[in-house]
Amino acid sequence: MMRNYNFYTYILTNYNRKVLYTGVTNELEKRLHEHYFGLYSIDGKESFTTKYKCYYLVWYERHQYIQHAIEREKELKAG
């Protein structure tokens, strides 16, 4: 059974708009803050968004179900 919440698929870019990052979250504002301040890393390694300075939100889409948000992220990444 899928749970009914607000989920977001989003795209960030860097200042020069040369790099794109696509992600999914249930708290868009909080997640953007985490990207901007580099608060999310894996095993102490610099995150992709920190490394490439992807701090600019260029697009987002709200979804009612997490599975729909994940499917949309996969579509976007596939091109």
Language model feature labels by segment:
Residues 76-79:
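Short, intrinsically disordered, charge-balanced linker/junction segments flanking boundaries
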Residues 1-40, 50-62, 68-74:
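GIY-YIG nuclease catalytic motif and its immediate N-terminal context
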Residues 46:
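Basic, flexible Lys/Arg- and Gly-enriched helix-loop patches that mediate nucleic-acid binding at interfaces
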